[in-house]
Amino acid sequence: MANGNASSDGPGNPLAAVVSTTGGVMGGAPSSAVSTYVKLVLLGLIICISLVGNLVVSLLVLRDRALHKAPYYFLLDLCLADTIRSAVCFPFVLVSIKNGSAWTYSVLSCKVVAFMAVLFCFHAAFMLFCISVTRYMAIAHHRFYSKRMTFWTCVAVVCMVWTLSVAMAFPPVFDVGTYKFIREEDQCIFEHRYFKANDTLGFMLMLAVLILATHVVYMKLLLFEYKHRKMKPVQMVPAISQNWTFHGPGATGQAAANWIAGFGRGPMPPTLLGIRQNLHNQNRRLLGMEEFKAEKQLGRMFYVITLFFLVLWSPYIVACYWRVFVKACTIPHRYLSTTVWMSFAQAGVNPIICFFLNKDLKKGLLAHLPPCCRTPPQLPREPYCVM
């Protein structure tokens, strides 16, 4: 009897296995429900922030004539792309999470959603690279930039960026099994496999080269600003004088005073020649101090946007390279979920950065707020005396 009881309660008993399995499922079900709830809340928050923030920035740029400039046109394009991504791609992710990480639509719709997700990723990379080039031209070659960077030039740049993005995202549509639903990521996206299985390595290299080239341009701009951080010293040109009548590039009003006082003979000296020369040198400057500060502020804002794009996308890019170079690899589910949600958060970060680092957008936002939400202006304090 003892042996019978021991054998019936041993680890090989099927009833014990069923009980242990049921206990494991019951223990894992609450954690899975909590994970699903957290994902839904986070993605819903990302969608709301992205839609509201990007639409507000877009409306401010469209309504304010002072913002009708090349950098704000590019910012408008970025905001509209993030708005479409949040409104079209993210709701399908919400539905797939709600259905237990399953795609309930057709295969064609999955390909369309995956195509749009890859399209917006490459669009942001190409646009940030073009913005970095224009920021460098605005400071290093301001005269050429002010003449050539017109509205139609901006339209041409935007069209070129969208064309290149479509060229990068469209070919996988015809490849069998390239765009598919990835259960671990809860989304339809490019299936990153071993580099000998498909062309995923070429796409990842193109994205990495774009991000690297963008930061190289900003580093070059930083070096240019560092070299030109100090003003050149004024070189004083001495005036010419034979009989106390100073003339030449360095002549000042003292020559006229000497002539009136009786020093020297002859006609009135050209006293303002040196001043005219200085004004001529000032007109030759390519970029004034106020313009330089404005361009530098815009460059700082766009670089922070680029930096956040790198920070939020780099973990997912690392996971993609992991799949490409390691055959039959297993990425930890928690790490992969975190990287995917970081890439989703990138769609709502740009408006926050713009309102924090751009004074013009901040003023435009405060001007359109109701009076109850505005902060009262601080009045200047006048000195007073206590008797």
Swiss-Prot record:
GO terms for cellular component: plasma membrane. Glycans are attached at N5, N198. Residues 1-40, 109-111, 175-202, 323-335 are extracellular. Residues 62-87, 133-153, 224-301, 357-387 are cytoplasmic. The chain crosses the membrane at residues 41-61, 88-108, 112-132, 154-174, 203-223, 302-322, 336-356. Keywords: Cell membrane, Disulfide bond, G-protein coupled receptor, Glycoprotein, Membrane, Receptor, Transducer, Transmembrane, Transmembrane helix. GO terms for molecular function: G protein-coupled receptor activity. Disulfide bonds join C110-C188. Its main location: membrane. It is a multi-pass membrane protein. It is found in: Cell membrane. Is a receptor for the SMIM20 derived peptides Phoenixin-14 and Phoenixin-20. It mediates the Phoenixin-14 and Phoenixin-20 augmentation of gonadotropin-releasing hormone (GNRH) signaling in the hypothalamus and pituitary gland. In the ovary, it mediates the effects of Phoenixin-14 and Phoenixin-20 induced granulosa cell proliferation during follicular growth. Belongs to the G-protein coupled receptor 1 family. This is Probable G-protein coupled receptor 173.
